[in-house]
């Protein structure tokens, strides 16, 4: 596939890989990010993106699939956060801060002690221009899996996202859908490590969804628009970084931040310019 696009656009294959990877990442981030933003779980997303680091290290050390190992740690972190919040008077944001810092510190120690080929900078900040074909295929199948799962459980995720109390009244297992979302979030986080790294993955999850939220009130429209915004900022940001020799992940995030800023002032929900004109 990449060879065809490389000949068609007269670009190196690694640039084509980066572009396709950015599109896959942008779309899947838009889908998952929409639920994260609606549920007001941006901090939880940040926590899980850091909590998977020990799983990444152990996967390398024991030669197991990184998606499997890191996702287990992501779910474990989500369970711990829920348990601490429910079984004590400690609020969820405090529990998130504790788990985030603890798991992240453990991951750094494991990486520093493990005699493996793990590059900490690569894990933290990513390098989308160095994505191999195997990871590109992995990103594609993660996207396909997320689309299938969200399509199958869309109604349940919709209801539980807007009103958990009503969800329980209808007999929905809200904990199941919460952890299903956390599992998808963990898998998406792991699959995006090589592209944008742990530090900036939360930006890919939140910025497109938050921008989309400013323009629409319907979840399906929010998901579609967030996916388009995510794919566009990924593709254009990658191109800008390639042409100007800039850090790719930072260029993608800054471009997305600019789009959000414009939307914040121009969207119908805020009507900033209209308010200024009326006053």
Over which residues does each language-model region extend?
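Small-residue-rich segments of transmembrane alpha-helices in multi-pass membrane proteins
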Residues: 51-61, 98-110, 130-131, 174-185, ...
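Transmembrane helix-bundle core of multi-pass membrane transporters
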Residues: 4-17, 88, 95-155
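Cytosolic-side transmembrane-helix boundaries in multi-pass membrane proteins
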Residues: 246-253, 257-279
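Short loop segments and helix-boundary regions at transmembrane helix junctions
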Residues: 34-116, 213-224, 241-243, 268
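Transmembrane alpha-helical segments in multi-pass inner-membrane proteins
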Residues: 201-250
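Short juxtamembrane and helix-loop transition motifs at transmembrane-helix boundaries
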Residues: 4-13, 27-38, 55-65, 158-166, ...
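Helix-loop-helix "hairpin" substructures at the membrane interface of multi-pass membrane proteins
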Residues: 136-208
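Loop-to-transmembrane alpha-helix initiation sites
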Residues: 18, 66-74, 93-97, 140, ...
